Amino acid sequence: MKISVLGSGSTGNSVLVSTENTTVLVDAGLSAKQILLRLAEIGINYDDLDGVLITHEHSDHAGGLRVLKRTLECPVFISEKTKHAYLAPKNSKNGEKESKLRNDAIGDCSVKIESDREFRIGDIDFEPFSVPHDAADNFGFVARNRGYRIATLMDFGHFTPFINEKLKGCDAIVVESNHSIDMLRACPVYSWELKQRISSETGHLSNEDLSVWLSAEYDGSARDIVLSHLSQKANDPFLAKITAESALNARGPLFRSDTRITLSDKGKPTEWISF
């Protein structure tokens, strides 16, 4: 099993999970054009996709889906609550028209999943789990194949004991490191209301939040940790990485020495992480 973050940031997120027999696109927050280009860049033909999995309806995770479905023939795996929210966009200027276009795009090709019940796509078992975020039915998941476990959780405001338990024993973790607390407070382009939303317990995880988890709760099993959903206005990639690495180094004797911290990028895919 292998994974690549096709692109990740405040403006768009897409991840690819693949085995020898199955390839799944997780979220379509990039433009359809960029998703297709980045699939090609890492050697994947879009015709080989077995499904598109949508974790929640926000535009930075589902904004490219409608146009992407003009090209793709594979089904869309989506929960009932998320589908309902996706088909009733709140912030669209042409809400009724956009809703119809979205329904036309995925109405007949969607597969209902539940955010608290395991499901399978091809030979990949998905173990979803709810995470605290201000969306209709947002979830993270652990993808399993041949004994390997890869977790992905991008949009969530804080760690919970339930999340901690789900992440134990994972070989790789794609996790949010959205903002620096100080940079968010000082950000001149974000309104006070937006800053409050981002920093809330149902908003987005900070570098500092992740550092505390790495120091106190992380079990040290993952060979790779990929930092995702970095804010372009309230974070710095070097700061995010050094904050995470410092937390690991502080407990170095307790952890495997080869744990790698990788930065995702909004503009290009990460290299494959393979098991």
Name the predicted role of every residue range.
Residues 63-72, 87-95, 236-242:
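Metal-dependent catalytic neighborhoods of phosphoester/phosphodiester hydrolases
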Residues 33-81:
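Active-site metal-binding motif and surrounding structural segment of the metallo-beta-lactamase
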Residues 80-140, 144-147:
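Metallo-beta-lactamase
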Residues 1-42, 139-155, 172:
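Conserved beta-strand hairpin/beta-sheet module of binuclear metal-dependent hydrolase folds
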Residues 43-45, 94-105, 218-220, 249-256:
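Short helix-capping segments at alpha-helix termini
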Residues 26-29, 49-57, 77-80, 151-154, ...:
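Active-site neighborhood of phospho(di)ester-bond hydrolases with catalytic His/Asp-centered motifs
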Residues 161-264:
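Cap/insert and terminal regions of metallo-dependent hydrolase folds
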Residues 5-14, 57-65, 83, 126-129:
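Structured catalytic core of nucleotide-sugar glycosyltransferases
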